[in-house]
Amino acid sequence: MLGKYQGGAYWFPGVIESIAKGTVTIRYDDGERETLGKRAVRPYDWMIGMTVECDFKGAGDWYSAKITSLAGEKIGVVYDDGSKEKTKTGRCRSS
């Protein structure tokens, strides 16, 4: 699943832990947990070739990148400047 963490503008990947009375509790791939309304979650739709933003080297700087590989929580991306990185889905987001 993808969830809008804290009602923000970006979608972050995670898994559903529970569903109750119009809410969904999601555990994000970075380990955070949150309970959201059903409108704040959507099916996971990331695929190779899709553009996302990733936290380059985990330093807190987010850059646009294209997905080059996906395997569970592992993701390969190439940034707009040509830099490549293998990272975790928990360090990426989509808009």
Positions of PLM-derived features:
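Eukaryotic chromatin- and chromosome-associated nuclear factors
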Residues: 1-95
